[in-house]
Swiss-Prot record:
Binds 1 Mg(2+) or Mn(2+) ion per subunit. SMART domains: Iso_dh. InterPro entries: ICDH/IPMDH, IsoCit/isopropylmalate_DH_CS, IsoPropMal-DH-like_dom, LeuB_actb. Homodimer. This is 3-isopropylmalate dehydrogenase. Its EC number is 1.1.1.85. NAD(+) binds at residues 272-284. The lineage of its organism: Bacteria, Bacillati, Actinomycetota, Actinomycetes, Mycobacteriales. Keywords: Amino-acid biosynthesis, Branched-chain amino acid biosynthesis, Cytoplasm, Leucine biosynthesis, Magnesium, Manganese, Metal-binding, NAD, Oxidoreductase. It catalyses: (2R,3S)-3-isopropylmalate + NAD(+) = 4-methyl-2-oxopentanoate + CO2 + NADH. SUPFAM superfamilies: Isocitrate/Isopropylmalate dehydrogenase-like. GO terms for cellular component: cytoplasm. Its cofactor is Mg(2+); Mn(2+).
Length: 339
């Protein structure tokens, strides 16, 4: 298994090291290539992502990312557009996958959260994030700024189909989240596509929520959800709320996936680089470890993905609110898997 590893910035290298430790506890065939990508490289020489980097990344089975970002040192948007989004578009990571699960001992801000266990399938290469927009008469009182939400039948259908396929392995329920009553063109395309693809999956029940209603239900009744499918912007917002109701983004893993398998998919914890605690050895690597489990599942190793997830669940339950150092958590989970 050839992995490209981008430790990145802040706590990224620390949590990624623990994820690799756990991966090696279940797989003896892990070959790693480290990549110096992120704010450190940009601040050192102004480079973000070269053609040579892309060519090399494509030679791997998957990519494991730690965190990217240096708030206050790099202007907003530079790393996001020049590195993360560039990689997403070039490697066709059209499925952004975000599982949300409330562990028994995790603290939810909800009084009665119920049994929360759902995934959000977010479209990753279209919508408002595709870079279709611009400004006119900038700096004047007549300035005009526009961002165009681009939605194609091809792009929408492949993500919707992915959501239905995932639902078949879960509780067989898909909820489309959009704003079809206002965004009638894009929303209409999404709704028609869901209706048509649903005919191929008669065992899967289908529901629809407006995005504003979905934010309410995610707080009042999150257990209603199994698989949510939505566009780029709505998915970005909704998944952060999902992280909050399940105990915070410290346990939130994600995958940026090319479902066709033509390019290596990338897996990462949702949290940022957290430069304020970098180097202190107190960052929680759990989300990075769960991202490694997602990576294995994507590559077809369901058995070891489940083993890691079960070991994480046991460790989270045992630790409760007790604080542990980054390496201690990785050591415990790796030891449990090696026993």
């Amino acid at each position: 298994m050839k992995l490209a590893v981008i430790g990145g910035d802040g706590i990224g290298p620390e949590v990624t090291a623990e994820a690799l430790k756990v991966l090696r506890a279940v797989r003896q065939d892990v070959e790693v290539t480290d990549y110096d990508l992120g704010a450190r490289r940009y601040l050192r020489n102004g480079e973000l992502l070269s053609d040579a980097d892309f060519a090399s990344l494509r030679e791997h089975d998957a990519i494991l990312l730690g965190a990217i970002g240096a708030p206050g040192e790099v202007p907003p948007g530079v790393l996001e557009r020049g590195l993360l989004l560039k990689m997403r578009f070039a490697l066709d990571h059209h499925v952004n996958l975000r599982p949300s699960k409330l562990y028994p001992t995790s603290t939810s801000p909800l009084a009665n959260p119920g049994d929360i266990d759902f995934v959000v399938v977010r479209e990753g290469t279209e919508g408002l994030y595709c870079g279709n927009g611009g400004t006119l008469r900038e700096g004047t009182e007549h300035e005009v700024a526009s961002e165009v939400s681009q939605n194609t039948r091809f792009g929408v259908e492949r993500v919707v189909r992915d959501a239905f396929q995932r639902a078949m392995g879960r509780r067989k329920h898909v909820t489309l989240v959009h704003k079809t009553n206002v965004l009638v063109n894009a929303g209409g395309l999404w709704q028609r596509t869901v209706n048509e693809v649903a005919q191929e999956f008669p065992e899967v029940t289908v529901d629809y929520n407006h995005i504003d209603a979905a934010t309410i239900y995610m707080v009042t009744d999150p257990a209603r959800y199994d698989v949510i499918v939505t566009d780029n912007l709505f998915g970005d917002i909704l998944t952060d709320l999902a992280g909050a109701v399940t105990g915070g983004i410290g346990l939130a893993a994600s995958g940026n996936i090319d479902a066709s398998g033509a390019n290596p998919s990338m897996f990462e914890p949702v949290h940022g680089s957290a430069p304020d605690i970098a180097g202190k050895g107190i960052a929680d690597p759990t989300a990075a470890i769960l991202s490694a489990a997602m990576l294995l599942r994507h590559l077809g190793d369901e058995e070891n993905a489940v083993r890691i997830e079960e070991a994480v669940a046991a460790d989270v339950s045992a630790r409760g609110d007790a604080q542990a150092r980054t390496t201690e958590i990785g050591d415990r989970i790796a030891a449990a898997l090696s026993a």
